[in-house]
Amino acid sequence: AFGAQFVFTVSAHYSVREGKSDTSKAPNHLPWYDWDSCEEMVLPNKCKLVGVELIDDAIELPSFHHPKQAAYVLGPEMGSLSKEMIKKCDYTIKIPTKFCINVQIAGSIVMYDRIRSLGKFAQRPQTEVEQKDD
């Protein structure tokens, strides 16, 4: 979904390929990288790493200009990105919420924001548009 070109994990504590919640069966359609540590990560040339983390100095998602070539990394469910991973990130962004949200929801929000901001979609109207009756 959302035009992803590859998927990766770092220090995963489970087998992604056996995940029950992946209804799209991503490992069957996308290149998949499993790295044991941040040091082993090798992203494509010119690819910016964007961390998604609820920290004070992160850029709020609505203000973030997504790089055209980017990989997004999210922390584990009920956890956070490691300090090493945050240091490796070119940018750190946050979804402006008052509390943490499910990692799958966070990933979907970020990727939707990316496709919306980089896509060639028409501008939204400034006022409510009247709906046509069927």
Predicted segment positions?
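Post-transcriptional modification and biogenesis factors for structured RNAs
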Residues: 1-134
